[in-house]
Amino acid sequence: MYKRQEVDLSNLQRQIIHSIADIGKAKVKSAKETMEAINPDVTVKTYREFVTSENVMELIKDYDFIIDGTDNFPAKFLINDACVMAGKPFSHAGIIRFKGQLMTYVPGEGPCYRCVFKNPPPKDAVPTCKQAGVIGAMGGVIGSLQAMEAIKYIIGKGDLLTGRLLTY
C-alpha cells in the first residue's frame, strides 16, 4: 500500500477500512491495522510516500499484480506507464459521484490505460472526489470488483476485464 495522506473525516463514508478513531492517523497505518485485525496471518507492507516517476519502478518490482486505486490522473498514468514498461499486469479503478469504472491490463492481451485514454485531462478539468463527492457504496462496489480482478488473475480462473472498460 502506498499512501502519504492522513485519514480525514471526509474519507470515512467511502473508505470503510478507517474509523473515527483513525482520523489524523496515516492512512497506510490505519489500513494495515484494520487488515491485520481482520486476519492476523496477512502480511501488509506499507510505504508512506507518494508514487513518483523516480520511485515507481522500485515500488512495483516485487509484486505480481498491481492494483491502482489512486484518485488522481497523473498517478494513474504513471502507474500505467510503469506497469507497461515493467511488463506487470494491473487493474485500474476510478470512482466519482454515482459512477465508477474498472479495467485490467495484462501484457500482450489488451490495451493499457493510456491506450484507452491517451493523456490526463487538463488540470482542474475534472473535479476531485472531495469537490464532486462520492457515494460511499460506489467505492465498495468498484473496490470489490477490482479485488475480484486480482483474485482471478492470481488463481488463473475467470474472465478478466482485459480489453474492456467496465462502467457502472
Show which residues each predicted segment covers.
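Adenine nucleotide-associated cytosolic modules
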Residues: 3-168
